[in-house]
Structures are given as C-alpha cells and as structure tokens.
Amino acid sequence: MTFILAIDQGTTSSRAILFDGEMRRVATAQREFTQHFPEAGWVEHDAEEIWQTTVEVCREVIAGQGIGPEQIAGIGITNQRETTVVWDKAGGAPVHRAIVWQDRRTAAICERLRHAGCEDDFTAQTGLLLDPYFSGTKVKWILDTVPGARDRAAAGELLFGTIDSFLIWRLTGGRVHASDATNAARTLMFDIHQGEWSKDICELLDVPMSMLPEVRDCAADFGTTDLFGGQVPILGVAGDQQAATIGQACFQPGMMKSTYGTGCFALLNTGTQPVASQNRLLTTIAYQLDGQRTYALEGSIFIAGAAVQWLRDGLGIIENAAQSGALAARADPAQNVILVPAFTGLGAPYWKPDCRGAMFGLTRNSGPAEFCKAALESVAYQTRDLWEAMQGDWGADADVILRVDGGMSASDWAMQGLADRLGAPVDRPVMQETTALGAAWLAGMRAGVYPDQAGFAATWALDARFTPKMVEGDREAAYRRWKAAVAAAMMV
C-alpha cells in the first residue's frame, strides 16, 4: 500500500498526518511546543523545538502504522507562514529564536519605511502592506540586533527561511535551501508578478539576497530525507492558508474559503491575473503549478480561535472550546455585547497594529454567556469585514458561498451565526483536514499517486450547508453596531 506523509507545522503544534492512496486519513500525531513572550507584543518559537516535534510526530505515525519508507511515495509540507528563522549555513543552528507571524516588534521599522514613502513600492511588487506581520522586517531586526549577524550575513554565512524552508534544510541534511512560491509571497521580499526575489525591496530592508532560498513550484522536487529509515522524497510545499485553499478545491476564480484557527484567513481565487486591492486586502499567490501562478486576494484576521482560548485561559468561563457554542446559546438576546478582539492589533482591512481589545454594551446582567457569544460573533463580524472588502475588489461575480474549515468550523452554532451575519451560505466539507490534505495532494499529485486538479476537485464532499436565518434588517443593524465598536476601539 502507498502512503503520503503530510507535515502540518502550525503556530501552536507540529502535526503529522498519514494519508493512503485514496486520500483517506489513516493516522495523526501531534505535539504542542512552547510559546515565548519575552516582551509585550513579542512572540517567539524555538526553531529547534519545532524541528524536534516535527521529527517526533512523523516517526510516530510511521511506526504506528508499521510501514517502511519505501511505502511513502512523498512528503508534503504545510506551515505557519511569515514566521522567520535565520540560521548558520555551516552548522544549521538558528542565531535567534524564530520570530512568529503574530509578533509586532518591527512596527517602528514599518512606520519609518512608510514615512519614507516606501509602502507603495512594497505593495506594487509584493502585493502586501508594510506591517510587522510579514517576514522582511523580522529578518532586518535579527540582522540589526543579533551581535555579528549582519557581518555574517554579508559574508554568506547565514541563511533565511520561513518554517518550510528551515524544515526542508534540516530534512535534507543541509542539501536543499528552498521554499515554494506561496511562502515566498508572504515574506515582503518576493515580486509576485515576476516570480522572483526583488532586489530593490531587499536593498530597502538591507537583507542580502544570498540569504534567500530558491523558490520552486508548490509541487516540485525539494530533495529527499533519510530520517525515516530510507530515502523519501519531499514533493509538495505550501503555506498553511494556501494549502487549505487547495484542500478546499478552490481552483476556479471567484471561489472563496475561510480557515478558522488561531486567526482567520480568507482567500478568494482571482485566477492567473493578480487583483490590486482597493480595500487594503493582500494580493498573494494562491498556488504555483508547472510554473503557472494562480493569484488570490487574502484577508488576515489575527484573532479568531484565540478569542475562545481567551475565554478559557484568560477568563476561565469554559473548560474547553467545545463548550463555547452551548454557552453562547444561553446569552440574553436583548443584550448587544460586542467584543473587538484586537489583542495583537487589527488585521485586514484595518491594519492597526497598535489597536487593543475592547468590549462594548456591558450591563449589570452581562456575564459568561454574553461574553462567549460576543467572542464567537466577533469572528463572524471580522469575516464580514473581509467578505465586504473582497466583494468590493472582485465585483459581482464573487462566489456567494463560503467554504469553511479549521477548528471553529466544527461548531454548528458558530457557523450558523457566520451565515446569518454574512447573509450568505456557508459550506463545511466532510474532510476537515483541508490544510494537511492540500499538502498531501501536492505531493501525491507530483508522485503520480493522486489525481489532477479536476479529479481532486470532484472528491470534495459537503458535510453541512448553513443558510442565513437572520432578518436582513437585524443583520445590518448588528453590523453597524460592530463597525461603530471597531471605530471606537481604534480611537482609544
């Protein structure tokens, strides 16, 4: 029997998922790792711990199924995007902890570049905005801050990579320094129109181009690893949100998916032509196959599932995320408590890194149920913000059905609330492991085990469709209250 091994390296855990030749999940292993918060607004990971947990989960699923390396046709990697690692080319040791996508320490660098009139240049080439979210200013910070790092980088002694690139380097024993187009497109240094690193942008950031990985298709040869008992090829790579877009089979222009994990990330396929957003969305690469780039509009929300984690860990009003829907359903419908969950700033379409969370509409009767309802509704309202922006950029032909995945999509209450606040149907697929499936399909398709795009799209199956039940007048009044709350939070 033939298998595909998917590595899903996320923000809070490393996972390995083994798929069989029919794209069925047969085994999963997961290890959480430590989150480091050395200062307010800073988030770091130990890249060595990421590496160790990744190897451990891979070995666990392989051993658990009792299979040999010759039965694994390929490895597909998907990863948290933007998170930045700089490591020693000779020994492979990181020179600093990985700076996570959520980290806001480079806000001042972004502001200086913005004041210098550089943002239009960045956006024109990369499709991105000047924000600490992206990798470029994180690399600059490491080179400027770690003693000797800038000189070593100039001498060609240091390498940069997002998590995929670091894992590929380690898996191949340092033989391959490469990334894929979707991860490169999130660095703030990649020209998404030319499909190459931008010399001009790298000069603005003072990042030597010798540090940068080679950029390849999402389904390509990324070398082989011998860490699992024999030679196994690495054949697929995509950033987590792009992998979910692939896993949701959003291959046609106008199709849209939204993934609900720690944050929420919505992508709308725009086909082979990039669409420049007029609503402060991101223009990015959805996937690149056979040298052909397919583009997307993306909206990034920093806090989605993390709001539910706050209910559990910060307020202690639930013991686990699965309880959130039932508690929210008990909220007083006469109350209009609104949470603006700007715990790490606001993402699209506002891009306010200094904004902080706020709650509005509290009364003496507001309690755990109302707080829980407000947290879940905040995710729906933020998705509505992205929905409106994407409709504005793409036009009337945008798909009126949203495909959803991620942990929060398992909640019927939350998904019904999402449909109500969007005023549009929400589709949840049978296969919820869309991110891992996307990575597995890339590797399996490259290996000749899995079908082509059309064949893969035909396997997508609906679990549940949530249709709007909210009266339109009530929906629009509630959305106006949300917009007013966001405006107030940004003024504090």
Curated annotation (Swiss-Prot):
Would the keyword Kinase be found if you checked this record's keyword annotation? yes
UniProt binding sites for sn-glycerol 3-phosphate: 11, 81-82, 133, 240
| CDD domains noted in UniProt | FGGY_EcGK_like
Q: Which UniProt keywords apply?
A: ATP-binding, Glycerol metabolism, Kinase, Nucleotide-binding, Transferase
Q: Extract the InterPro entries matched here.
A: ATPase_NBD (IPR043129), Carb_kinase_FGGY (IPR000577), Carb_kinase_FGGY_CS (IPR018483), FGGY_C (IPR018485), FGGY_N (IPR018484), Glycerol_kin (IPR005999)
Summarize where ATP binds, as residue positions: 11-13, 262, 305, 309, 407
Top-level division of the source organism's lineage: Bacteria
Q: What terms describe the molecular function in GO for this protein?
A: ATP binding; glycerol kinase activity
Q: Show the SUPFAM superfamilies listed in the entry.
A: Actin-like ATPase domain
Instruction: Describe activation and inhibition of this protein.
Output: Inhibited by fructose 1,6-bisphosphate (FBP).
Catalysis performed (reactions): glycerol + ATP = sn-glycerol 3-phosphate + ADP + H(+)
Q: Which residues hold ADP?
A: 11, 15, 262, 305, 407
Q: Name one GO cellular component term.
A: cytosol
Q: In which pathway does it act?
A: Polyol metabolism; glycerol degradation via glycerol kinase pathway; sn-glycerol 3-phosphate from glycerol: step 1/1
Protein's job? Key enzyme in the regulation of glycerol uptake and metabolism. Catalyzes the phosphorylation of glycerol to yield sn-glycerol 3-phosphate.
Q: Member of which family?
A: Belongs to the FGGY kinase family.
Name-wise, this protein is Glycerol kinase
Q: Say which species the protein is native to.
A: Ruegeria pomeroyi (strain ATCC 700808 / DSM 15171 / DSS-3)
